[in-house]
């Protein structure tokens, strides 16, 4: 048997779930919730119960005795009225027992239409037509004229049941056509098919509404009265055409008390005494004023009626506008009176009975004041659409509140819903000209540029593709590309004003010639490796620096300050090794004078030529020191001759280059060299301002285990003081300690003074410029700005490199890779190692430096090497025992060096091992076939041959050539000289040669014996 849910049955019966559950409970049918299931017979019982009661309702009518029984002074159950405030609270949801279309019975009319009073027996119809036909101010709905077949369910909670009449009175159904129609608020044309939300009705003692208040869908075009009501509606429609408007005074009752207190009016045609009705009316007014406690919240919502009912109202109003027997209620609030709309019937259910409220007089007045402010109730607008906005309740979605066309009649369809309007497409606002200018750095990410311009990144990528630039969202583009693509979108790009330049320009004071003083010269000693540069400097400084150098060679720049009898000289000792090109270049840039050391017995070497080029590029004068004059094979003329070929012509030969012959071993010529240096510096007129902010260059930098980043700097201008904020390259800090070249702490350093400083935030690069600032905050700002630019450049470089490698590697074999982690003691050595190692990269093997830095090898380096499968190279650094143990556990290879030669040679050996071998063919010998012999029992053909060159030997491959074409490539099966098997046959001898699986040997063929030789790739070794 099929079952049905309670909520489904309620939907079919046009009832709320709560109302149906109440009905089921009254019928002793078990249903716990709206999801409970009901049998078919149960559904039939419910339908029969509801429909049967409705049929009775059409045949009976409430008598006046019922009303008198419902009028106690207190809200007792005997009262059958529900005040407007309670009806408003339910808002039409009291219609618990809404039935399908059918005739309305008297029982149902008695129970559901509780506010409807019994009609009086006064022969009003005989006296005047205005008493049995509602005037324009009569807000009573002629419900029988409305089509009861279109029933709608309200969406609010049902009204509370106060009392069900025990004995509903019976009355002829023909009386229904005499019930006056209610006031029409919205016209049928204005709100077609609008569902009515009935209002609570107050009942006077002598007036009764004979019809139940149902939620009826009112449509002037669709509503048709039943039976005898149709004739009356047609008559009313004709009357409406004759009188289209009603004067305002017709809507006001003569009795002011009746305007204030009476809440509903129904005109009876019963024979009742008018005086008695008026007396009881006044009696009831006092009771209602005392008992009302809540305002009529939905007083403004009116019941829409059909056009026929409206016509009847207007017609009857013109016939007897001032009749004293007309109802004591106004249809709507007038401009002057406190009267309220009376015919707003509540949407009560079958069992609902209206209870009068208390203390609603003040509420009435306040409501009427609001209506007056809104201008409701003027002349000619008795049926004004004041209740139109609230005559139908519905669920409104949040998005509907923001759509246009949601209010007014034009935006509504015939079914009462609002038409959906097309949403407008978002308009792109064009920024002002001043805002179409973007400031960027040297590089910028594509997504960031698109964000600043307010466009989509995809559109920018399309433009770049059209310009021939393949870019991704996260890829960086340079300033020029950004300018071009921004111009496509009518944007202007300019470089951001560098904040650091503004800060640094403030520090740069104008050079005052009066404050300039002479400063010591900065001399850089350059030359080829092992030509005695450091030894010469040791003699000058009277120290033993060279003996402490690993391998006897200098591997980083040393800055020293030497005091002589004639003045102070600052020396910079640079490496002479080929790997330290950048150091020599940097030394030449920060120096005033270059001393080129050349060994008298060795002459000009490659690094000597390089030093000459660096000096010329820096436009620095050169003084040549011919060293090792104490050796037997010393030839200074040879040195002068070779240097003249490179543009350095000695003064003795008519040039301008000073030559000094010295011996670092014996000390010969040292004083003369110093005199020449000071003489040259006087010619240069070297001066500086010690009072200006300190500036200079970083000569060397390293990471000390105990002190942190340590930088060796050379002050060019001004005076550097301890505790002063400085900026060195990408890093900044406050100077904590300053140490001179002798290891002593100093408080200040003047021009041309080399010192070591401690306190920077990181290890700067050698050659970076440093500037002393007044504020540590400014120093940090400049440092952060430089760091940001550096990161952007690195990111752009990586992005381009990745794309280039991707295109190169497409379709190519996998390239082997040697990964390294390099740690060095100073930044200069680290830089030299990186440059030298990267030059060793081959096409078959790529070298990747995963990480490089200064300082000791730590645990993080070992972890990184374990993850990336890299080799750790330590240059002049050693790990701690804990790091060694960790490297052993992680199986990480660590190598330690003190001399750069050994590092480079080992790297070359590793590259050689990774490079694939090549195979070469080596011809061992050739032999010509002079005759052929066939061995029948073996099926072999032997070629009698003569060895033309080389030798023919077993174990090698052999090929047969005929007219230069290879006919066979196989191995020797037989090699004999006469009848003896031999291992090989030398040049000029004859032999018999047989080839495996080949017998087509002819006279004149050539046997060629060869082997395939595997050759390992070789990388040139650096000579120690």
Swiss-Prot record:
Nucleotide-binding in keyword set: yes
Name this protein carries in UniProt: Translation initiation factor IF-2
InterPro entries in UniProt: EF-G-like_DII (IPR053905), IF2_II (IPR044145), IF2_N (IPR006847), P-loop_NTPase (IPR027417), Small_GTP-bd (IPR005225), T_Tr_GTP-bd_dom (IPR000795), TF_IF2_bacterial-like (IPR000178), TIF_IF2 (IPR015760)
Region (G4): 627-630
UniProt record similarity statement: Belongs to the TRAFAC class translation factor GTPase superfamily. Classic translation factor GTPase family. IF-2 subfamily.
Lineage of the species this protein comes from: Bacteria, Pseudomonadati, Thermodesulfobacteriota, Desulfobacteria, Desulfobacterales
Location(s), subcellular: Cytoplasm
Biased composition (Basic residues): 365-375, 407-423
Record GO cellular component, one term: cytosol
Biased composition (Polar residues): 316-325
Transmembrane segments: none
Gene (UniProt): infB
Domain tr-type G: 518-687
Positions with a binding annotation for GTP: 527-534, 573-577, 627-630
Function recorded in the entry: One of the essential components for the initiation of protein synthesis. Protects formylmethionyl-tRNA from spontaneous hydrolysis and promotes its binding to the 30S ribosomal subunits. Also involved in the hydrolysis of GTP during the formation of the 70S ribosomal complex.
